Amino acid sequence: MLSKDFEIYYYNDNHFYGVTDHTHDYYEFYFFLEGNVTISIEKEHHHLKPGDMVFIPPGIHHHVSSVGETLPYQRFVFWISQDYCQKLKELSKD
């Protein structure tokens, strides 16, 4: 992450070949909009449908693979650091 707290990105790929298995030290929220991809989380595979949301905690192995190139691969990705997430939790205590 470039920011110390959080980042949000919109991606639109006409040709996506996948990424290798990896982890992060931050939380990842993945909002799937369009495409034909499978996300693998800790070796469990899920074919994504438009509107699906995936939450990936820090340290969890994951990767995305393209199933076909018939549609653009569109998604929002939101990353939030563990420290900032903890600050938000503390602010929302009753």
Predicted regions and their residues:
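Generic protein-terminus/edge-of-domain signal
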Residues: 1-53, 90-93
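Conserved metal-binding segment of the jelly-roll/cupin
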Residues: 48-65
